[in-house]
Regions:
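Nucleotide-sugar donor-binding and catalytic loop/hinge architecture
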Residues: 12-22, 174-193
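Membrane-proximal basic amphipathic "stem/tether" segments
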Residues: 1-30
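Active-site and donor-binding regions of nucleotide-sugar-utilizing enzymes
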Residues: 23-174, 191
């Protein structure tokens, strides 16, 4: 526990001392979200964006991205809370709901961007305020965009920019797939978590 605190503190100091322009900062809670945002990072890099930083609470992400991105490991919640309060960047891109409830927003971060890690309805599995404090939302499709606009009207939430990006996770699966593979057909039984 103390080791995580110390590593988190050291990485927070390194992050704040990094004088590079912080254009795109991604935050990931776990390596299990990696496939949900990796295609977005790769597309930004393909378009020539160089100022991409990953802050992660999973040490495995640091190892995975060490040759690709600047990464900072911050796992300790107290240090993470400080990071979120003092963050100075143009875009913070994350998949954390109820922003401003558990972790506070920084006045120095221009745009908070949410991307989905589920294809579910925004009105069925999330809290009413799950997306209230975001500036930009990357929606998986028209159904989510319509639900988000409906919530803005119904609850008088601030209007946000909603961009239909599709589901990044499906891009990741497609990029990994080997379409030339000849296999016998299988039946997949995949129960949902709801």
């Amino acid at each position: 526990m103390f080791n995580n605190f110390l590593k988190s503190l050291v990485n927070l100091i390194k992050f704040t001392r990094n004088n590079k322009k912080k254009e795109f900062v991604f935050y990931s809670e776990s390596k299990f979200y990696r496939d949900y945002y990796i295609s977005l990072i790769l597309e930004l890099k393909r378009l020539g964006q160089k100022n991409i930083i990953l802050v992660t609470s999973d040490i495995d992400d640091v190892d995975f991205f060490k040759n690709t991105l600047t990464c900072y490991y911050i796992k300790n919640f107290f240090i993470l809370s400080i990071f979120f309060k003092i963050l100075n960047c143009k875009f913070l891109i994350l998949t954390l709901t109820d922003l401003g409830e558990h972790l506070q927003k920084s006045k120095l971060c221009k745009f908070y961007v949410y991307f989905f890690h589920a294809l579910a309805s925004t009105q069925k599995i999330y809290t009413k305020t799950a997306f209230k404090n975001y500036d930009i939302i990357f929606s998986n499709g028209k159904y989510q965009s319509e639900e988000l606009r409906s919530a803005e009207k119904q609850f008088s939430f601030p209007k946000k920019e909603i961009v239909d990006t599709g589901y990044f996770f499906l891009d990741s699966i497609r990029n990994k797939a080997n379409f030339r593979l000849k296999e016998k057909k299988h039946i997949l039984f995949a129960p949902s978590w709801n």
